[in-house]
From Swiss-Prot:
The modification O-(pantetheine 4'-phosphoryl)serine is found at S48. Its cofactor is pantetheine 4'-phosphate. This is Acyl carrier protein TtuC. It comes from Teredinibacter turnerae (strain ATCC 39867 / T7901). The keyword Signal does not apply. GO terms for biological process: fatty acid metabolic process.
Length: 87
């Protein structure tokens, strides 16, 4: 008997970085090229409602349940993308 495994698609850190750069650039109405992946999130100037939206949308997109604490502990695009990719 042959067993068939179904694999869920893997999200890489690079996928998350791209998603976050697009999201933040859209919210701030700036070019994605202006986004530095090592800049702490609070330096982007996102207000609290934008951060809540980011958390909800990123959780839905990635399938990884994250919260505000995850962003505080992984306070840059680079750090958060590594955290999510490891889940």
């Amino acid at each position: 008997m042959t067993t068939v495994e179904t694999l869920e698609p893997t999200i890489t850190a690079e996928d998350v970085q791209q998603w976050l750069a697009e999201y933040i650039a859209d919210v701030l109405e700036i070019s994605e090229s202006a986004i530095d992946f090592d800049t702490p999130f609070h330096q982007f100037g996102l207000d609290s409602s934008a951060v809540v939206g980011l958390v909800a949308d990123l959780s839905e997109w990635s399938g990884v349940a994250i919260g505000i604490k995850s962003i505080r502990k992984n306070n840059s695009i680079h750090a958060l993308s590594q955290f999510i990719a490891a889940k």
